Amino acid sequence: MPQRSQPFNSYTGHSGVRGHGVAPTVLVLALGFHGTAAWADCQTAGSAVTCDASSPNPYTGTVGSGASSGNLTITVGPGARIESGNAHAISVGTGNTISLDGNAQVSNSVTTGGPGNYNAGLNTIEFEHTNTLMIGADARVAAEGTDPAAHAIAFTGRTNVVTNYGTVSSASGAAIWNQLEDNFVSNTIYNYGVIETTANGGDAVVIGSATGNGATDRGMTLYNYAGGRITGNVVLGEGDDTVRLEAGSTLTGSLDGGAAGTDVLYLEGTSGSGELTQDISNFDEINKIESGATWTLSGSLGANSSGKATVVNAYNGELIVTGDNSAAAAGSAMTVWGGARLQVNTTSAMAAIQSNGSGVAAFSQQTDGTYAGVLSGGGNFAKEGAGSLTLTGVNTYTGALQLKEGKVIVSAAENLGAANSRLEFDGGTLNTTSDMTSARRTTIDAGGGTFEVAGGTTLNWTGRMLGNGTLVKEGAGTLALSGFNAHGGTVVNAGTVQISNDYGLGNGALTLNNSRLASTADIYAEAAATVNGNGTFDTANGTTLQWMGDIGGAGALVKTGAGTLLLGGDSLYAGGTVVNAGTVQVFKDASLGGGALTLNNASLASLGSFSTARAATLTGNGTFDTTVGTTLGWTGDIGGAGALVKTGQGTLVLGGDNQYAGGTTVNAGAVQVARDANLGAAAGAVALNDARLASTGTFSTARAATLTGNGTFDTATGTTLGWTGDIGGAGALVKTGQGT
């Protein structure tokens, strides 16, 4: 993995100036041959050239004569100034060491251009090969003229090193210019200070390279350390270029690696942050290295005139990419490595993103967006931000998709990565828009996890649900849970949750908000439940759902499906119980909550003896099934258009002033009444099918009766039952009891 370049050896030969692997520059005080001090403006003693602040200051000539001036040590002392006007200030060849001490200044102001000593313009400071330029704190190199071909510093050769703690400035040309044909070795810039152009308000080339004339290998290495500032655009040449930027540094303009060569950008730092706000182009690699620092790239990446692809690597720390990268060259991609975090959105993400190890590639999506690229690798991906992320690609990652905020929308299981990938919820939503099946293991953390299933579709989730958070179901479709789950509870706000084993709902409570729980097998549950609005329990034919926990809430409990729902808790739900299909079984009145009972071609089965004063409505036929040896006392009024049907070998005691219109059919056991009004509307008939009608009071009735099997009339001692209505049927009339 690439590592950050560390500063080399330091020394204190000049005020605040550190060296980078070069021979120390010696401050020369223009010593004479006999060692006596001879201060002047700029003087030469052997290979040493010293400029100080003595009069005349500034010095207005040129130090050096181009390629013939080599192996010199040139020192511009504190406060000294070289102002060369329409000419070079320093122009030397090979092997020179140049230093500007604190508050020194070297400048020119070229207005009438000329070829200069290297046919490269009248640059302020220029040199050929293997030179070292040290610019101390508060020192300044400036090209202050109007000629755009006159640069503040110009490389006309290779293996040169510039270290800047002061300011390098240009009013028209570049602050630093790289010009050479056949330059196979990089020139190097270490910046701790300011490198700037003031041309066009700072929106001009500040560090650049020549093009054409066969110059195809101009390489450059640029370091911008914390506190360093580069104002303007950096446009590198056609060689192999390396740019290393440390958190806390500033580059205001765009960054262009050049049309050829291998160009690499490193984003470094162990603390703090850095940001590049303008476009980055023509780089083969952009590498975020070192932990601790966060870098943000808000310009475009990879819109390369060279056509080469750009690979963005997040090796350590955090890299945030927010620009529009839709024009990135073909093959451009992003990779995040173990321990690092890459943040993108659907506009800034490149066509392929790979996450490895413990790395996380996060889509921070504040608005809705679609990503059609490919997500791969063994690492993790995350969804953050309130917006929706629609994934349409065939993704192959084997790590986790972490849903923290907003929605991830998918239409096929392969949008969620490999079949063995994972889902981790902590506040986010998975929205499925078509039928699909997934065996992915899922974790729901404290922030909860929402499954939104589109209407008319079913999401079969066979993987296990873990975690202490709550599963929330949205959408009109069906979420089928068949894993052995252990999550922290289930809230169904819309549609249906379907379970097929005792563990489908995890370890917590159930809440139904105008929604439905469907069971497809015999299931036993002890969890508490809440019904807000109608809460529907749908049980498949031939199956029983035993719900032994208490059920509360302001809503009604609605029973659908041909199967059986057994209620065993002390329930307080206020909206009543509506049985539209199948059977509800109870041991006690408290299991039916606080409201009325409605039976619509459905059954209430009592498994123990108890009495209730609740009202009941028979919208279709309503069956009361009493277990042998038990008595159900129903003293509340029973109304509705349907018939009351009695099954089971136990006894149903009716005590209300009932108005149900469909008559009374007793198919097993006994119905016991004390007065005619207990048997519903006066026009309603009674049918006995090998069953019994017991009267405990004296009364008469004109209602008809049918004995489809033997029909027993049991009259209590001391009472008389007067039956003036017609009695028909194939069965026998049997009289029991001591009454008349």
Predicted regions: what is each one?
Residues 48-61, 72-86, 99-120, 131-149, ...:
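Beta-strand-rich solenoid/repeat architectures in extracellular/passenger domains
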Residues 95, 103, 129, 158, ...:
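Conserved consensus positions within extracellular tandem repeat modules
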Residues 54-56, 77-79, 95, 103, ...:
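Tight coil/turn sites that cap or link beta-strands
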